[in-house]
A protein has these predicted regions:
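Extended, solvent-exposed, turn-rich assembly/linker loops in the middle of proteins
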Residues: 2-73
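Sequence/fold signature of self-assembling virion shell proteins
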Residues: 5, 9-12, 54-175
């Protein structure tokens, strides 16, 4: 989202004199200027509610398919809008390692310089989801002290990559 015009700031859903539909259509147009394929929008529940109130019964449903599961979601101009919890829509996150003092809880939290996102629009092919699994440890029933059963332990890590030539295909709308 480094290219000029691919980041919009200062919109708060529900503020008088603003239009959620206009903001979304501007984002879709900006991405379509440089990309011709299918797009997807991830949006906060607040933004989706404002969009639905503006369109009052006129919003179209689209079938979004991922991993063999088909889901009906709202759409604008054929772009499915996926509801994403607000606590996952930040410009920067801090990853807690679970070991360091103050990071024992693990997981992630909002970064100190982070701003909240309303939504982002990108081609479905831009983000590449990667999963990695640590070495699996297998314990037989004689070693497993909790149960008379086999036990397997492993850690799974997830990451989302955007290739160096694709950041300009992502449009961010920041609060």
């Amino acid at each position: 989202a480094n290219k000029a015009g691919m980041v919009a700031r200062g919109y708060t859903p529900g503020v008088t004199g603003t239009s959620a539909l206009r903001k979304l259509k501007e984002a879709i147009k900006a991405v379509r200027e440089g990309y011709n394929g299918a797009l997807v929008c991830q949006a906060t529940p607040d933004f989706i509610m404002e969009l639905e109130l503006e369109l009052a019964g006129k919003i179209m449903a689209a079938t979004f398919s991922k991993g063999g599961i088909q889901t009906q979601v709202p759409s604008v101009d054929g772009v499915p809008i996926i509801s994403t919890p607000s606590n996952r829509m930040y410009t920067v996150i801090k990853i807690n390692d679970g070991k360091t003092s103050g990071q024992e809880k693990g997981g992630y939290e909002k970064g100190t310089t982070a701003k909240s996102l309303n939504f982002f629009v990108c081609p479905v092919t831009t983000p590449i989801a990667v999963t990695k699994q640590d070495i699996m440890r297998i314990f037989d029933p004689n070693i497993n002290q909790k149960l008379n059963a086999w036990q397997m332990d492993y850690r799974r890590f997830h990451d989302l990559w955007v290739l160096e030539n694709k950041p300009d295909s992502v449009f961010l709308n920041i609060k």
